[in-house]
A protein has these predicted regions:
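Intracellular juxtamembrane helix-capping segments at the cytosolic ends
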Residues: 96-109
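Extracytoplasmic gate region of multi-pass secondary transporters
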Residues: 1-34
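Structural signature of the two symmetry-related core transmembrane helices
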Residues: 58-73
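A late C-terminal transmembrane helix in Major Facilitator Superfamily
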Residues: 108-143
């Protein structure tokens, strides 16, 4: 949960600055694009069960790969296409990734431990929200003002999230 939310929280924390800094998309559109990403996240959550049915064991890498694609589009394609497609990928990754992590944690912990697992997931979520900007600030202090540094940082976190997700054992077939 920490890696997922770290990858996600870098988007709303830096999207307006990054996008307006490019000068292609006007500031009047930024809030609408971010709201659209939230709407896409809703659909990601609603479609999670269907995605899980189609991807089966591949579900564990779905969200990390979408974060990677989303931040790659934001960083290297840019413009309207990269911004809209990247935002949609990041929103969908967040929307589908959270129910995956919750269901996986509940499955592994068992029914009796669910009351302790959910607070721990919430703690990881809030810790990521707190630490992501602080880690980015520390990175900026080390390397200086690099264009799209927040997106590069998010790409690194998404790679870590992908590697961590690959460690999740496949579910037994029913």
């Amino acid at each position: 949960m920490f890696l997922l939310m770290s990858a996600f929280f870098l988007y709303p924390a830096n999207f307006a600055l990054e996008t307006s800094g490019d000068g292609v998309i006007g500031q009047q559109y930024i809030a609408a694009i971010m709201a659209g990403a939230d709407l896409v996240a809703l659909f990601g959550g609603l479609l999670f069960v269907r995605i899980q049915g189609v991807l089966r064991g591949g579900t564990k890498v779905f969200a990390p790969l979408l974060f990677l694609v989303g931040y790659l589009l934001l960083t290297f394609l840019g413009g309207w296409a990269g911004t809209l497609l990247g935002s949609a990928c990041i929103g969908f990754a967040n929307g589908a990734g959270i129910p995956f992590l919750i269901s996986e944690a509940a499955r592994r912990a068992g029914k009796d431990a669910t009351t302790t697992v959910m607070p721990l997931l919430s703690a990881a979520l809030y810790l990521a929200q707190l630490l992501s900007p602080l880690l980015l600030r520390a990175l900026t202090a080390m390397v200086g003002d690099v264009p799209h540094l927040s997106y590069y940082f998010a790409l690194a976190i998404a790679c870590l999230f992908l590697l961590w997700s690959l460690r999740i054992p496949a579910r037994a077939r029913r």
